[in-house]
Amino acid sequence: MSRRHAAEKKVIPADPIYGSVTLERFINKVMMHGKKSIARKIVYSALERFSKKIGAENVLEAFKEALENAKPLLEVRSRRVGGATYQVPVEVAAGRRDCLAMKWIINNARNKPGKCMEVGLATELIDCFNKQGATIKKREDTHRMAEANKAFAHYKW
């Protein structure tokens, strides 16, 4: 282990419109090449489309619910024992849960064919809110993989 002190976590300020730290982290994940104003524009217009489509009064609550539906509870980690590598199911930490859900939503929005990012992101958020779509499938696959390797759960760290 390193003898240096542990790195301090950067405190992220809340976003200016909704006052949410979670939304600001989401904007930071959407951002590419340091262009935050473009990322903000994309996320805010996607949230507007999302709220109109689902008919929610509180956009932030609907966004958090969509994010909650995408969060994985379990994942598998490789663990080498003897000469064999086992896929050991472990519980996902709270911070990593958020991070994975955001990453999956954004990647699936980017991979939507022939759509601009705003439309793709809004569509993916709607799908997550309704518990369907590629992000939810990814979450279910992760859970299925953990369930299939439940026999190796005793190899925990």
Swiss-Prot record:
GO terms for molecular function: rRNA binding; structural constituent of ribosome; tRNA binding. Gene3D superfamilies: Ribosomal protein S7 domain. It comes from the Bacteria. GO terms for biological process: translation. Keywords: Ribonucleoprotein, Ribosomal protein, RNA-binding, rRNA-binding, tRNA-binding. GO terms for cellular component: small ribosomal subunit. InterPro entries: Ribosomal_uS7 (IPR000235), Ribosomal_uS7_bac/org-type (IPR005717), Ribosomal_uS7_CS (IPR020606), Ribosomal_uS7_dom (IPR023798), Ribosomal_uS7_dom_sf (IPR036823). Belongs to the universal ribosomal protein uS7 family. PANTHER family: RIBOSOMAL PROTEIN S7 (PTHR11205). One of the primary rRNA binding proteins, it binds directly to 16S rRNA where it nucleates assembly of the head domain of the 30S subunit. Is located at the subunit interface close to the decoding center, probably blocks exit of the E-site tRNA. Part of the 30S ribosomal subunit. Contacts proteins S9 and S11. This is Small ribosomal subunit protein uS7. The gene is rpsG.
